[in-house]
Amino acid sequence: MAKKIDGYIKLQVPAGKANPSPPIGPALGQRGVNIMAFCKEFNAATQKVEPGLPIPVVITVYNDKSFTFIMKTPPASILLKKAAGIQKGSSVPNKTKVGKLTRAQLEEIATTKEPDLTGADLDARVRTIAGSARSMGLEVEL
């Protein structure tokens, strides 16, 4: 018989830097999950990812206090800021532009985010990422 799911925990954890301090410790502790086991497994799974890059993770907690987790791709906004070389997006995106991205950069981000995007083909995914870039005040060359 399959294990009964007790709940889900959604977190954004820096790659390779999971530790028992907040927000990870309290979120897992409330459900009775072994915090150090999660930290070790997560850090091992994110060894090949750039250290410090925030990785969204969905932790499934079972009623016997065991867990599994699914890692998603980094948020598009983080990847866009990194590609444009900026610290933060524009506060008035329709007036003030803070950077510029080429189609090649957008394609690279779209292929990175491919598992999490719903676009049918690469062009549709690029348009999705371009929309996110425009809403951050980045100029897009398509």
Swiss-Prot record:
SUPFAM superfamilies: Ribosomal L11/L12e N-terminal domain (SSF54747), Ribosomal protein L11, C-terminal domain (SSF46906). This is Large ribosomal subunit protein uL11. Part of the ribosomal stalk of the 50S ribosomal subunit. Interacts with L10 and the large rRNA to form the base of the stalk. L10 forms an elongated spine to which L12 dimers bind in a sequential fashion forming a multimeric L10(L12)X complex. The keyword Metal-binding does not apply. Transmembrane segments: none annotated. One or more lysine residues are methylated. It comes from Acinetobacter baumannii (strain ATCC 17978 / DSM 105126 / CIP 53.77 / LMG 1025 / NCDC KC755 / 5377). InterPro entries: Ribosomal_uL11, Ribosomal_uL11_bac-typ, Ribosomal_uL11_C, Ribosomal_uL11_C_sf, Ribosomal_uL11_CS, Ribosomal_uL11_N, Ribosomal_uL11_N_sf. One of its GO terms (molecular function) is large ribosomal subunit rRNA binding. It comes from the Bacteria. One of its GO terms (cellular component) is cytosolic large ribosomal subunit. Keywords: Methylation, Ribonucleoprotein, Ribosomal protein, RNA-binding, rRNA-binding. Belongs to the universal ribosomal protein uL11 family. Forms part of the ribosomal stalk which helps the ribosome interact with GTP-bound translation factors. It holds the Pfam family Ribosomal_L11. GO terms for biological process: translation.
